[in-house]
Amino acid sequence: MRILRLITVFTFLILTACDFNVPLVAKAFLPIDQTLLGTWESIPEDWDGQEPLERLVIRQQSANLYEIEFGDEASHIYFKGWLAELEGIRFMQLECTGDDKGPVDAKDKRLFSVVSFTLGNGELVVRSLNTDLVSRDLVNTAALQVAFAANRDNPILFHKPDQFRRLGERSVDDLETRK
């Protein structure tokens, strides 16, 4: 059970660790994808049924923005997200907005992450942008875009998949929300 908890914490850190100081795509132009909305529960490989599962709650904030909450019974992290496309690759740009302790600190620099996603059979697979290919140390959006373009055909541009299953519509209110 301790190993499962460590895996759960590791998955939480992978999904929520903000990697970049600047966004890959700064503006939200694409309309939201309604099929992403709702509550998603993690699908761990070796779950024993004892530990709480993480939940990913995706709500519509505007025509182009999502409000995203990720966590388990003990802690949550909050993002705003928007769909983007670059080099023919569709992804979601995430910006960390806070956690259970409140909004992000003005001193925090790494507020942005980039994830790809696939939907099918009631499951959502989320993959993180590979920071071995697109360095966390790039300091502006243009440099990030150049590195992204240079690796666009690399099969591990997005890696470390996390799987989630869709829960019923009533589940959107299961997690406490911060307003």
Placement of each model-derived feature along the sequence:
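Calycin-type beta-barrel ligand-binding domains and close structural analogs
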Residues: D19-T35, I43-R55, R59-K179
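Exposed boundary/loop context
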Residues: F10-T11, P31
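C-terminal motif of bacterial Sec signal peptides marking the signal peptidase cleavage site
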Residues: I14-A17
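Sec-dependent signal peptide recognition
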Residues: R2-V9
